[in-house]
Amino acid sequence: MARRRKYEGLNPFVAAGLIKFSEEGELERIKLNPRTAILVSITVIIAILVLNILHPL
């Protein structure tokens, strides 16, 4: 029988080869303050609500 490799401590996506890393800090390209993320989310929600009120489907 074939032996299965054990990927201990790895993310399943990395183990499956779906994500390829060339450098360790590659995912940290976008630095976003949590307060900014919340404000952008609230702004988008308010914009959607206002557009829904102005032009209902």
Curated annotation (Swiss-Prot):
Residues 56-57 are extracellular. It is found in: Cell membrane. The keyword Transferase does not apply. GO terms for biological process: protein transport. Its main location: membrane. The keyword Ribonucleoprotein does not apply. The chain crosses the membrane at residues 34-55. Residues 1-33 are cytoplasmic. Keywords: Cell membrane, Membrane, Protein transport, Translocation, Transmembrane, Transmembrane helix, Transport. InterPro entries: Preprot_translocase_SecG, SecG/Sec61-beta/Sbh. It is a single-pass membrane protein. GO terms for cellular component: plasma membrane. Component of the protein translocase complex. Heterotrimer consisting of alpha (SecY), beta (SecG) and gamma (SecE) subunits. Can form oligomers of the heterotrimer. NCBIfam families: PRK01253.1. Involved in protein export. The function of the beta subunit is unknown, but it may be involved in stabilization of the trimeric complex. Belongs to the SEC61-beta family. HAMAP family: SecG (MF_00751). This is Preprotein translocase subunit SecG. It comes from Pyrobaculum islandicum (strain DSM 4184 / JCM 9189 / GEO3).
